[in-house]
């Protein structure tokens, strides 16, 4: 397990990166405010004589988990999206590099600071979610315009039904051995939903370059419009519907109810740029669940912090409604 850095170490890293930034980008940092969001990577809002920016340091241990070539490609694509009018922050470059390395081998990026507000899961209004759908459609269109070579195979490889059922049986046994009766119902729910899965339909889903982390913490909104799509670090070649399912569940599910009019508004925005067949949102949500459920539902889920707890709730909701999603959303 990679541990977060202590405040003293973080302060030392900032002092080093402050000097680097002022040298590379020829601005003077007047104030720096830590941003306490994200896992392990350090972030600060910089107020400078050239405007406001965000400094992001890549944790050395976490960086080892990245495919480094894909990460650089993702940052370069973020820059291309920005240059083509998509709402995502511009990166400051030095000698055409989007990522920079300090004397002590700290990797970092500097982005323009985008104005806007975070909105809680399921709390978007129809104008906001329409704007988001439109921006994601434009993003998917640009990422797959031929500038990038098509990936060899999607990142997500759906396991067989038998493998997944065995997984849930193992988790069920683990919860029983730990005496966690309160978690058993969540695991049994996943088992029951898995019985309904048709794996073949997932393979028919369109493949392409996608963001892979489209949840509310990575969106900013201003005046009923999306002002920023953030954090392209996980961008990869995958099933396009996974992006759609992730955004819809994050933005339209609230208090155990999926707001159908919000889902419709998102899809209307998306179709402003790209076609998505009527009813395919059902498969998008089902496939999202098949990919993510094992990440969030397990014997130790009672120790989740707030975001994983929300994701676990989403997975439980999809599992509970897996068989009725078709009836609920087939006309969208």
What do these predicted ranges mean?
Residues 241-275, 290-306:
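Active-site activation/catalytic loop segments of kinase-like enzymes and analogous catalytic loops
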Residues 16-24, 147-150, 164-212:
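An alpha-helical support segment within catalytic cores of ATP-dependent transferases
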Residues 48-148:
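ATP-binding pocket architecture of kinase catalytic cores
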Residues 60, 108-121, 171-173, 290-309:
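A glycine-centered beta->alpha junction motif in the catalytic cores
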Residues 1-88, 92-93, 331-332:
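Conserved NTP-binding catalytic cores of kinases and kinase-like/nucleotidyltransferase enzymes
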Residues 122, 126-180:
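A cross-family kinase active-site recognition segment
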Residues 39-47, 54-55, 91, 194-242:
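Active-site acidic catalytic loop and adjacent metal/ATP-binding pocket
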Residues 5, 295-332:
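ATP/Mg2+ or Mg2+-diphosphate-binding catalytic cores
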């Amino acid at each position: 397990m990679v541990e977060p850095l202590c405040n003293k170490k973080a302060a030392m890293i900032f002092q080093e990166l402050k000097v680097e930034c002022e040298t590379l980008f020829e601005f003077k940092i007047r104030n720096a405010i830590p941003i306490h969001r994200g896992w392990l990577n350090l972030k600060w809002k910089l107020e400078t004589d050239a405007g406001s920016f965000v400094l992001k340091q890549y944790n050395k241990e976490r960086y080892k988990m990245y495919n480094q070539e894909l990460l650089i490609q993702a940052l370069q694509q973020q820059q291309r999206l920005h240059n083509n009018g998509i709402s995502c922050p511009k990166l400051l470059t030095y000698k055409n590099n989007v990522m920079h390395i300090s004397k002590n081998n700290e990797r970092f990026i500097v982005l323009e600071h985008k104005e806007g507000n975070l909105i809680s899961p399921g709390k978007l209004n129809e104008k906001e979610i329409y704007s988001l759908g439109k921006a994601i459609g434009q993003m998917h269109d640009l990422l797959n315009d031929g500038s990038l070579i098509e990936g060899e195979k999607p990142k997500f490889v759906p396991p067989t039904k038998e493998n997944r059922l065995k997984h849930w049986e193992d988790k069920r046994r683990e919860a029983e051995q730990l005496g966690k009766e309160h978690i058993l119902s969540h695991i049994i729910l996943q088992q029951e939903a898995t019985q309904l899965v048709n794996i073949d339909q997932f393979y028919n889903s369109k493949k392409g370059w996608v963001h892979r982390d489209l949840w509310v913490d990575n969106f900013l909104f201003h005046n009923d419009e999306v002002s920023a799509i953030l954090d392209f670090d996980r961008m990869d070649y995958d099933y396009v519907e996974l992006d759609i399912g992730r955004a819809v569940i994050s933005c339209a599910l609230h208090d155990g109810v999926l707001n159908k009019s919000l889902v419709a508004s998102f899809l209307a925005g998306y179709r402003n740029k790209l076609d998505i067949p009527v009813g395919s949102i059902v498969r998008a949500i089902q496939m999202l669940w098949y990919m993510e459920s094992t990440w969030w539902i397990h014997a130790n889920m009672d120790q989740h912090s707030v975001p994983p707890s929300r994701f676990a709730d989403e997975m439980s909701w999809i599992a509970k409604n897996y068989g009725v999603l078709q009836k609920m959303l087939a006309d969208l």
